[in-house]
UniProtKB/Swiss-Prot annotation:
Stated role: May be involved in both secretory and endocytic intracellular trafficking in the endosomal/prevacuolar compartments.
InterPro entries according to UniProt: Prenylated_rab_accept_PRA1 (IPR004895)
Chief localization: membrane
GO CC annotations, alphabetized: cytoplasm; endoplasmic reticulum; endosome membrane
Subunit structure: Interacts with PRA1F2 and PRA1F3. Interacts with the cauliflower mosaic virus (CaMV) movement protein (via N-terminus).
Organism the protein comes from: Arabidopsis thaliana (Mouse-ear cress)
Family note: Belongs to the PRA1 family.
GO BP, sorted A to Z: transport of virus in multicellular host; vesicle-mediated transport
Signal peptide range: none
Residues bearing the modification N-acetylalanine: 2
Highest taxon of source: Eukaryota
Residues that span the membrane, as ranges: 68-88, 107-127, 129-149
Protein name: PRA1 family protein D
Tissue-specific expression: Expressed in hypocotyls, roots, lateral roots, lateral root caps, columella cells, leaves, shoot apex, stems and flowers.
Length: 182
């Protein structure tokens, strides 16, 4: 049983860190420049937050962990809440069932958010954690606005119009589409 838990934690951790973009790309100083307009900055923030979302999450988690290092009870609560998130939300493949009732993932997320906030308030570090997360988000948005997006791979920057802009033809007859005559 314990071996299965450790294996599950390892696999999920490798999956999460494997999804992170290379740190060399994240910190590439030659990719930084001032945006030409507010619209350009907004586009950069949106694209960089999408592209580097795992990197940003890792940085915020480390900052939050370092903030709590002076309060041992807060660290224990942080670990317990982190494990609850891991086992009840991230590492589950089948729906959560309690006493024969299937619990929706949205309800699980709301309950875990409540547990997270409750543990921050109970341990007395909510203001410190809120300040750290606020500062971290500000720095990450600044990074996202200043880092250019020209060199990013567009595999996760899909057009919201999807296949409507396809030029492959795909059996369609140009602008007419795939209509049959009357």
């Amino acid at each position: 049983m314990a071996n299965q838990v450790i294996t599950g934690i390892k696999e999920t951790a490798q999956s999460i860190t494997g999804a992170a973009r290379p740190w060399g790309d994240f910190l590439d100083l030659s990719a930084f420049s001032f945006p030409s307009s507010i619209a350009d900055a907004t586009t950069r923030v949106t694209q960089n937050l999408t592209h580097f979302r795992i990197n940003y999450s890792i940085i915020l988690s480390i900052l939050l962990g370092l903030t709590l290092i002076t309060r041992p009870i807060a660290i224990l609560a942080f670990i317990a809440v982190g494990l609850a998130w891991f086992f009840l939300y991230f590492a589950r493949e089948e729906p959560l069932t309690i006493f024969g009732f299937t619990i929706d993932d949205g309800i699980v997320a709301v309950l875990l958010i409540g547990l997270s906030i409750g543990s921050l308030v109970t341990t007395g570090v909510w203001l410190r954690a809120l300040t750290t997360v606020g500062f971290g988000v500000l720095v990450l948005i600044l990074h996202a606005a200043l880092r250019g997006t020209d060199d990013l791979v567009s595999d996760d920057l899909e057009s919201p119009y999807g296949p409507m802009l396809s030029t492959s033809g795909g059996g369609n007859d140009g602008a007419r589409g795939d209509y049959s005559g009357i």
